[in-house]
Amino acid sequence: MAGNVQEKQLRWYNIALMSFITVWGFGNVVNNYANQGLVVVFSWVFIFALYFTPYALIVGQLGSTFKDGRGGVSTWIKHTMGPGLAYLAAWTYWVVHIPYLAQKPQAILIALGWAMKGDGSLIKEYSVVALQGLTLVLFIFFMWVASRGMKSLKIVGSVAGIAMFVMSLLYVAMAVTAPAITEVHIATTNITWETFIPHIDFTYITTISMLVFAVGGAEKISPYVNQTRNPGKEFPKGMLCLAVMVAVCAILGSLAMGMMFDSRNIPDDLMTNGQYYAFQKLGEYYSMGNTLMVIYAIANTLGQVAALVFSIDAPLKVLLGDADSKYIPASLCRTNASGTPVNGYFLTLVLVAILIMLPTLGIGDTNNLYKWLLNLNSVVMPLRYLWVFVAFIAVVRLAQKYKPEYVFIRNKPLAMTVGIWCFAFTAFACLTGIFPKMEAFTAEWTFQLALNVATPFVLVGLGLIFPLLARKANSK
């Protein structure tokens, strides 16, 4: 009994802070401001009230329901809908990281360029083909690093991540107070209530996927539900606190961006270089030169490297670590002496290499290439969130079978409605997000659209092939 009490020592504020570091990042503010300008303030309020808060609390219930499961979403699906769909959920969780892995080396080069040169000119020195070739070489190098299992890199990444988190909060505090402390002039003039009201048209709708992408990932919090003291009360309190913290940072951060960058005339490369522009301007406000920007760029470089190495290895081992031989061929699970899934790494390399080099056939600008990969992530990555809501709907449907310590909504029809709403909204965001955010019907727009449509179908569709290969191998 004493041991059980000892294990449940997390309080609501511990949950809120741990979750905040997991879910939030300064890039979320910059990317969505680049898409919407100050209108994003309204969008954040909508997303937090009607999507993120129920999403986080749904994760809380699922984590409490399957407290002994280690596979996360795939465990939830396996218990509620069977091993076949559980495999597909695990496959989706892994394969949506492929565009993320393809984009990370480029983000590392951008951060490194700002740290070394103090501007964003490094990637502009290369043609698109040369840049992507360098990106591929960088990815292969870090794949080798991942195969070596360098624990010290994860420690460096954790320190860098905390530093970026602290600097993101520092940015909000220093930028919002700058007009009162310094003589800085606000870039966006004549701000009224109408400045924040969106014009609901097709262009606005296509940017919703980036908002969903920004607030996703709450399922990583689920293992902590049953380590929380009085989870029925403290966990939802922690999640509500998380929603408030993220909302405050998103709204104040967006207002701070509006002070620095004219909402009606947003720089074309803000999505690519906006984080560094922001800290550079902040340094100018407080007569600190490039000091803040360089510190952030170094921290971001180290954080991006650690995130890349972790994302090469961890999701793949989740997929293959508890693989069912009926769905995944044994050859794909083969490991070497150091425990690295060799064929799994090779499959990752092939898919990432294709996604790195294929865009060079139709995207001729490094800035557009970066924005395309980021937008592709906003379409593909939320596909894994769909399985969270599928699992929740299944748990609600089987309410008599499960008795979790924490229940989000006890009214069954209302709970089902919320689950369906979150699923439908995520699917809608993914579908509308496939349309490129640029002049329509040009050759490059058509090329990007084709890639945006084909990529999720091909990546998820590959998961349907492996059970056939496994069946063939097993029959022999």
Question: Where on the chain are the PLM-derived regions?
Answer:
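Membrane-interface "cap" regions at the ends of multi-pass membrane proteins
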Residues: 1-42, 46, 52-60, 68, ...
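C-terminal membrane-solvent junction of multi-pass transporters and transport-like membrane proteins
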Residues: 6-7, 335-336, 385-435, 447-448
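Helix-loop-helix junctions that connect adjacent transmembrane segments
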Residues: 8, 42, 125-130, 155-294, ...
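Transmembrane alpha-helical segments of multi-pass small-molecule transport proteins
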Residues: 12-19, 117-151, 165-173, 211-215, ...
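Hydrophobic transmembrane alpha-helices that form the core helical bundles
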Residues: 54-61, 69-135, 304-315, 375, ...
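TM-loop-TM module centered on a large, flexible mid-protein loop between adjacent transmembrane helices
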Residues: 75-76, 82, 238-309, 328-377
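Helix-loop-helix connectors at the membrane interface of multi-pass transporters/channels
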Residues: 78, 106-130, 167, 227-231, ...
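Membrane-helix boundary/coupling elements in multi-pass transport proteins
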Residues: 92-108, 220-224, 287-330, 385-392
